[in-house]
């Protein structure tokens, strides 16, 4: 058994629930205790998608001791179903407790369909991947439609597969992918599952191509639809390749759109790149820990396209256990100047007092992105990401420069020489000059070397002052490795 530190994803029924509730005309029954709705839906979606309580067509069976130990879940499910619209189809998803007692059995005389999320075995993305295909199997046509020739002047149709609740930055990225598809002259058919009606699911099979929004889930459905599909791009070069490949498949010319984008959407990117922050780009390292879609895309864009050094990059992949112990160790050892990640990474930075700038790029964490002006994907996303990096550098510079009030509180600079009288500091300890032993000096150099280049000078000063203050507090004439360690433990430095 492997103990997972700070879990970064939910179980299977969360993913299935977020997919099913995104479809219009489908009601969802969660077979489990009341918390199985309160946590993933009422609580979490409020902090990630800004959804008010009871916004979605969900009911929970509310299993208690009676059902768990004696009667089973069937009667509770029938009571839950009776509160829904009997004319509309419903699907039941089972939480882990319900799965352990064999729950999810649909009562006779109802129109409830059953989907088994396998929440004990699968994470939210694995289950979401199966849920998308299940919707097509249950509500799509029995036979896959054959591709039909387009009429003269008719636009090719492209579906966007994957947008659903609980996905970081989804509204902005969906808007950008739609803009790109329409920009080259195609038409967006079905956005699935978000906002798609049950009756429109069958239209998925009539498109000329599909775009898979995320690497975590959606590809299984894209394969099932038997149409060419393309991965939604993150970054400059990836977006250009995406547009050209999609256009070639659809028989369109993307170059006029790409040329317009260079003078409009992408123009601020080059202006930002030539701005006053350009002096720091070669040394302003970044780290990223996020879903594979963003971790892979942002690293490729910032490191390969733009030349920023990458301190580390970790992808959260479907079905792969997280390595948060390694993430924590890397952040503690070499904190980057710009950290893209989730609440977990922000917490790890705070543990060591890291002064790098944090940019939300993943869940878990409270980060609402309902507005469509914060894309990571496409050309707009490339410009937005560089803008975020530039602003992070400005913010880092602000914290490097000392405040006037802090300078006023500082102790006077000591004069050198044996005849200078010893003065008492604010804590009563002598403020005489101290020396550094070899081990402490070597450790200081190591700690400073671990810091981003931009903040090394200020980090070295804070660390040196704190260690010397610790030595003086002991009445010592020499800063030892122990003094340095005390300063680190007290959080006075770096």
UniProtKB/Swiss-Prot annotation:
The keyword Oxidoreductase applies. The keyword Transit peptide does not apply. Pathway: Porphyrin-containing compound metabolism; bacteriochlorophyll biosynthesis. InterPro entries: BchZ (IPR010244), ChlB/BchB/BchZ (IPR050152), LI-POR_suB-like_C (IPR013580), Nase/OxRdtase_comp1 (IPR000510), Protochlorophyllide_Rdtase (IPR016209). GO terms for molecular function: oxidoreductase activity, acting on iron-sulfur proteins as donors. Its EC number is 1.3.7.15. One of its GO terms (biological process) is bacteriochlorophyll biosynthetic process. It catalyses: 3-deacetyl-3-vinylbacteriochlorophyllide a + 2 oxidized [2Fe-2S]-[ferredoxin] + ADP + phosphate = chlorophyllide a + 2 reduced [2Fe-2S]-[ferredoxin] + ATP + H2O + H(+); bacteriochlorophyllide a + 2 oxidized [2Fe-2S]-[ferredoxin] + ADP + phosphate = 3-acetyl-3-devinylchlorophyllide a + 2 reduced [2Fe-2S]-[ferredoxin] + ATP + H2O + H(+); 3-deacetyl-3-(1-hydroxyethyl)bacteriochlorophyllide a + 2 oxidized [2Fe-2S]-[ferredoxin] + ADP + phosphate = 3-devinyl-3-(1-hydroxyethyl)chlorophyllide a + 2 reduced [2Fe-2S]-[ferredoxin] + ATP + H2O + H(+). Keywords: Bacteriochlorophyll biosynthesis, Chlorophyll biosynthesis, Oxidoreductase, Photosynthesis. Belongs to the ChlB/BchB/BchZ family. Converts chlorophylls (Chl) into bacteriochlorophylls (BChl) by reducing ring B of the tetrapyrrole. Chlorophyllide reductase is composed of three subunits; BchX, BchY and BchZ. Forms a heterodimer of one BchY and one BchZ subunit. This is Chlorophyllide reductase subunit Z. It comes from Erythrobacter longus.
